[in-house]
């Protein structure tokens, strides 16, 4: 529960008259309202009250600020707005006021008139129109719920679900306090605009009934409400209360001045706070302070007013100027911030674009790096294989070079030996030729011829053996050379294979040539012998013994002759002599 509003005014003429009390018993409860001021001389027949109304979501109660039925003169401390005195009364309590008294009465009708000049002629109370009035609202809803405020806990709440709107006045003129109340109650209000019924609520008790109507006006200056309260089963006493409102309600000028001063200070503090925050974010004071000070506050204050009113107007003008400065400051700050936010948004967009481009470049470079790493790994593997193959080929080349050098040395030695053999052969042939010449000069006969043939055959056989050895050596060297070429040609491909085959064929061809040469030499020798034998004079018949030397490791030769004996292959040779008898016949 919170305080809804202050309902408190001051009168130009206030006194220390004992406060009278307005007693209400609509639902067996009493609310007391008092108001007192101790600054002006007392005025006769006037009732003063000071109240505070608390409103909440469930109920609304009234708090009296002055002690009930106080006879003492209130001090200025107690008349201030901070002084409070909450008074509650039991429903059984009954207060008697010589001025105003509202007791239980039968339900009656509430009369509202538009004429403010009308006066109710009552012997008890005369109500005149005063310019200062106020509105008091008493709202009670759901009284079963316990109040939330610590000031109201433990107090007696009002039963029922009634909403009561009551309007009282500040000044009531007391005519005659000794007379009784008339059983009719009327309330006259001055309503500027047409009244409008807002809300009405009904509440019934087992032994009584009561109807309460809430009426208010649309005028923002004053609100006019009248209530008829009262009902009692045992008492039929009626009292008449006439409430008339004619002027607008006014607040305390001191409270209003303090409020304006507080608002001016808060507005100035807000402006300085905004300026400080603006300087923190990089703005300058000269850019946002208004330089137009031509408007003079004093010239705007009308003359003929009190100093208090002038001070209030000055506060209002200062607050207006400070509000304009704060507004310009906020607008310029927001424009600068909007511009900076635009720049930051553009920078952020460019940075995001750069980020996306860099991410794309990074992904592309990562793929390139992976491909480069794979390529580098394959190149390293190939390089390792090539280095290994190069080492193997270099070792093979080194071995082949060594073999080539050794073969060259051997070939040079063989050539040198071959030259020596050829030189020996020429010497032997020369010697043979000389011997033949000597033999031909000395003697001619079959024995000599046989001797010469034997020597010639011996030398021929020696030459053949030498040639065969030389051929074998040459073949061996050629085979080694071919093997070397084979090893070299394995790396060169099919061309080397053809070259190797060509070398083999050339070697075979050379062997065949050498064999043909030997056979041709033997054939030429045989022809020469036959020719020489034909040139000699014949005597009857001559027997020629041809001696040939065969190797006996061929058993197939036994098929040709009956007397052939097989000799196992070995290093020994056997000479077969064939005698041939020639008979020469002469023609007659």
From Swiss-Prot:
Keywords: Actin-binding, Cell junction, Coiled coil, Tight junction. One of its GO terms (cellular component) is actin filament. The keyword Coiled coil applies. The keyword Oxidoreductase does not apply. Residues 332-442, 502-530 form a coiled coil. It comes from the Eukaryota. It is found in: Cell junction, Tight junction. One of its GO terms (biological process) is actin filament organization. Disulfide bonds: none annotated. GO terms for molecular function: actin filament binding. InterPro entries: POF1B, POF1B_HlH. Interacts with nonmuscle actin. Plays a key role in the organization of epithelial monolayers by regulating the actin cytoskeleton. May be involved in ovary development. PANTHER family: PREMATURE OVARIAN FAILURE, 1B (PTHR22546), PROTEIN POF1B (PTHR22546:SF0). This is Protein POF1B. It comes from Pongo abelii (Sumatran orangutan).
């Amino acid at each position: 529960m919170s305080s809804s509003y202050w309902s408190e005014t001051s009168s130009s003429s206030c006194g220390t008259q004992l406060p009278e009390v307005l007693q209400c018993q609509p639902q067996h409860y009493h609310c007391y309202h008092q108001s007192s001021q101790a600054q002006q001389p007392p005025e006769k027949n006037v009732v003063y009250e000071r109240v505070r109304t608390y409103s909440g979501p469930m109920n609304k109660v009234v708090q009296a600020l002055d002690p009930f039925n106080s006879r003492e003169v209130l001090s200025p401390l107690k008349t201030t707005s901070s002084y409070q005195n909450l008074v509650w009364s039991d429903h059984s309590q009954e207060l008697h006021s010589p001025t105003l008294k509202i007791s239980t009465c039968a339900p009656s009708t509430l009369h509202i008139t538009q004429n403010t000049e009308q006066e109710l002629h009552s012997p008890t109370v005369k109500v005149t129109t005063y310019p200062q009035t106020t509105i008091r609202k008493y709202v009670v809803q759901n009284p079963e719920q316990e109040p939330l405020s610590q000031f109201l806990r433990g107090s007696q709440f009002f039963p029922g679900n009634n909403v009561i709107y009551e309007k009282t006045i500040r000044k009531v003129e007391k005519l005659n306090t000794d007379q009784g109340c008339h059983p009719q109650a009327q309330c006259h209000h001055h309503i500027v605009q047409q009244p409008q019924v807002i809300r009405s609520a009904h509440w019934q008790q087992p032994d009584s009934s009561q109807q309460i109507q809430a009426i208010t006006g649309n005028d923002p200056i004053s609100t006019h409400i009248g209530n008829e309260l009262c009902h009692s089963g045992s008492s039929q006493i009626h009292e008449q209360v006439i409430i008339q409102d004619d002027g607008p309600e006014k607040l305390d000028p001191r409270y209003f001045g303090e409020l304006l001063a507080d608002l001016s200070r808060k507005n100035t503090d807000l402006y300085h706070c905004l300026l400080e925050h603006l300087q923190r974010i990089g703005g300058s004071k000269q850019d946002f302070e208004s330089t137009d000070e031509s408007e003079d506050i004093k010239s705007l204050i009308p003359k003929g007013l009190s100093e208090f009113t002038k001070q209030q107007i000055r506060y209002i003008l200062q607050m207006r100027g400070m509000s304009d400065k704060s507004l310009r400051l906020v607008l310029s700050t927001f424009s600068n911030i909007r511009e900076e936010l635009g720049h930051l948004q553009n920078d952020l967009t460019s940075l995001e674009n750069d980020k996306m481009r860099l991410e794309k470049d990074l992904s592309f470079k990562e793929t390139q790096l992976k491909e480069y790493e794979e390529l580098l790994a394959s190149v390293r593997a190939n390089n390792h294989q090539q280095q290994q193959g190069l080492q193997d080929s270099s070792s093979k080349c080194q071995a082949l070079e060594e073999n080539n050098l050794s073969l060259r040395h051997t070939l040079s030695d063989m050539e040198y030996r071959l030259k020596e053999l050829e030189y020996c052969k020429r010497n032997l042939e020369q010697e043979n030729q000389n011997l033949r010449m000597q033999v031909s000069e000395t003697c001619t006969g079959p024995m000599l011829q046989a001797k010469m043939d034997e020597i010639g055959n011996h030398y021929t056989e020696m030459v053949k053996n030498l040639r065969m050895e030389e051929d074998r050596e040459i073949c061996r060297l050629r085979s080694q050379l071919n093997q070397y070429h084979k090893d070299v040609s394995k790396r060169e491909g099919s061309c080397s294979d053809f070259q190797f085959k060509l070398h083999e064929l050339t070697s075979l061809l050379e062997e065949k040539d050498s064999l043909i040469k030997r056979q041709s030499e033997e054939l030429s020798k045989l022809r020469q012998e036959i020719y020489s034998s034909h040139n000699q004079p014949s005597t009857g018949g001559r027997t020629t013994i041809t001696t040939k030397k065969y190797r006996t490791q061929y058993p197939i030769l036994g098929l040709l002759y009956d007397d052939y004996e097989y000799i196992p292959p070995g290093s020994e040779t056997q000479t077969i002599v064939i005698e041939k008898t020639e008979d020469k016949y002469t023609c007659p």
